[in-house]
């Protein structure tokens, strides 16, 4: 990436910090597809995971490092040799595009109660961590965890030392979302004034949203001179989430008068597609009134507003929806459309799929074509994401029959395949879906408590595909999010619940 004084590096941590949100875990295949879309979006750095934390994270980072080209691929590590070595190994395939991101808490409360170490020990550990990471990669980022609650003098000291040790990016996180904009901007300015070699590195910020100020704090820091911003798509993340990258990007794009002509490599037309993909893959719905990408972001209900929009869009819209991807779909496909037409449309939508995956999607496409007249892009996206989200099926649905009559007790009969064994059971319930879920529990021996159940229409019309998302708690230990789609909502509900069971058994 070509760096100028006004070039902002966009660092995406959706696959690492964003995935820490309860119920938002993604499979390696889902993470890879999100990473490919992030590359199309034009982010500069993808933080793909925390390799030492689990074998799954290690493999996911390795796969993304091998297959995703364009952005830098980053792995997180504590300032511990085992962490740094795991990150280096996972990032091998990225070669010169690899970045190791080491972090260490610096605030007084963390030094005293979490780490039980004094300032000198903290500096020593940070310097050793950066030096070790530098043996493996040229691009090393250091984060001073809880920087916004760290004494400015000590923060400046440790930043100076890690720069001398070889850090190329220094990150100033508002880890618990405590800062307010002017205060955070003042901290960034303080570092520019008091760290001797700070002009030799990139100054980064990473803000959390506990007080609803993550985006505001990030923008204030950029105005103060920060030239890397870290965040997630849709603002997902633990607790109240992270800074929403799409909001930061559009604020910079819409208000150059306020922030200066800050340049990024972001392809604005990919914003909406990226938002929707992350929502579907993570199972976290985007709130309807969310800025930029919410369903209501460009909806105008008041008559006066509608009249103004019709006369001149700019009366009530400060962003042209088309520039971020809010456009009408192309002509729909039908059951008579062939495999070549389907494959071509999938490429236009940005999906790169294996032959076997396209075969499976084409088979489902034909089945849906028998049930509905037109198949729209959103229908295709739902089919693709169902394919991407597939996991090893310990139990596979073979047959379902539901009996519901007015005044009677709903009953469901379920047939599942478990390897070579076919298992059948039935149950009654408060409704058809409840009865089916209880029958699945009887067969699998799992005991799922349905925490959330959401059904939405993928497209319009009576023949629309219904997409069901469930959050299920198994034995009060594991919260699992799963989804499925079908023109039959009851079938989609059962498949979604069974997907959750299979996920819990992994």
UniProtKB/Swiss-Prot annotation:
Chief location: cytoplasm
Its job: Catalyzes the condensation of the acetyl group of acetyl-CoA with 3-methyl-2-oxobutanoate (2-ketoisovalerate) to form 3-carboxy-3-hydroxy-4-methylpentanoate (2-isopropylmalate).
Entry EC number(s): 2.3.3.13
Keywords carried by this UniProt record: Amino-acid biosynthesis, Branched-chain amino acid biosynthesis, Cytoplasm, Leucine biosynthesis, Manganese, Metal-binding, Transferase
Organism of provenance: Methylacidiphilum infernorum (isolate V4) (Methylokorus infernorum (strain V4))
Entry protein name: 2-isopropylmalate synthase
Annotated GO CC locations: cytoplasm
Pathway: Amino-acid biosynthesis; L-leucine biosynthesis; L-leucine from 3-methyl-2-oxobutanoate: step 1/4
Every Pyruvate carboxyltransferase domain range: 8-272
PANTHER family, per the entry: 2-ISOPROPYLMALATE SYNTHASE 1, CHLOROPLASTIC-RELATED, HOMOCITRATE SYNTHASE-RELATED
């Amino acid at each position: 990436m070509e760096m100028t004084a006004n070039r902002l590096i966009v660092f995406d941590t959706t696959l690492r910090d964003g995935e820490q949100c309860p119920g938002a875990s993604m499979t390696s295949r889902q993470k890879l597809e999100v990473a490919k879309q992030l590359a199309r979006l034009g982010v500069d750095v993808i933080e793909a995971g925390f390799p030492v934390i689990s074998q799954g994270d290690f493999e996911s980072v390795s796969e993304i490092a091998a297959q995703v080209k364009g952005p830098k691929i980053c792995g997180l590590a504590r300032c511990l040799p085992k962490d740094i070595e795991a990150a280096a190994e996972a990032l091998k395939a990225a070669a010169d595009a690899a970045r190791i991101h080491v972090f260490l808490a610096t605030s007084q409360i963390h030094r005293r109660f979490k780490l039980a170490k004094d300032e000198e020990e903290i500096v020593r550990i940070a310097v050793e961590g950066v030096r070790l990471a530098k043996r493996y990669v040229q691009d090393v980022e250091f984060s001073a965890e809880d920087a916004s609650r760290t004494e400015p003098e000590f923060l400046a000291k440790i930043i100076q030392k890690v720069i001398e040790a070889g850090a190329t990016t220094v990150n100033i996180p508002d880890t618990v979302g405590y800062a307010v904009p002017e205060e955070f901007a003042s901290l960034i300015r303080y570092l520019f004034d008091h760290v001797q070699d700070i002009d030799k590195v990139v100054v980064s910020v990473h803000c959390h949203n506990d007080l609803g100020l993550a985006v505001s704090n990030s923008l204030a820091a950029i105005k103060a001179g920060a030239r890397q911003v870290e965040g997630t798509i849709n603002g997902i993340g633990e607790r109240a989430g992270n800074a929403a990258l799409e909001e930061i990007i559009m604020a910079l794009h819409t208000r150059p008068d306020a922030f200066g002509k800050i340049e990024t490599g972001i392809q604005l037309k990919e914003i909406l597609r990226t938002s929707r993909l992350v929502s579907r893959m993570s199972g976290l719905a985007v709130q309807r009134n969310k800025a930029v990408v919410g369903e209501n972001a460009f909806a105008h209900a008041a008559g006066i507003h509608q009249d103004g929009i019709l006369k001149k869009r700019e009366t009530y819209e400060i962003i042209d929806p088309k520039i971020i991807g809010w456009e009408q779909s192309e002509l729909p496909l039908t059951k008579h459309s062939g495999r070549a037409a389907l494959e071509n449309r999938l490429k236009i939508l940005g999906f790169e799929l294996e032959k076997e995956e396209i075969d499976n999607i084409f088979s489902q496409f034909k089945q849906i074509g028998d049930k509905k007249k037109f198949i729209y892009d959103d229908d295709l996206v739902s089919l693709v994401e169902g394919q991407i989200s597939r996991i090893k099926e310990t139990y596979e649905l073979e047959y379902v029959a539901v009996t519901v009559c007015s005044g009677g007790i709903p009953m469901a009969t379920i047939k599942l395949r478990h390897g070579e064994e076919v298992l059948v059971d039935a149950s009654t319930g408060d409704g058809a879906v409840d009865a089916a879920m209880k029958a699945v529990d009887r067969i699998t021996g799992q005991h799922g408590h349905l925490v959330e159940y959401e059904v939405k229409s993928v497209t319009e019309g009576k023949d629309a595909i219904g997409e069901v998302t469930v959050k299920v708690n198994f034995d009060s230990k594991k919260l699992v999010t799963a989804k499925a789609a079908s023109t039959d909502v009851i079938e989609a509900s059962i498949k979604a619940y069974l997907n959750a069971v299979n996920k819990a058994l992994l």
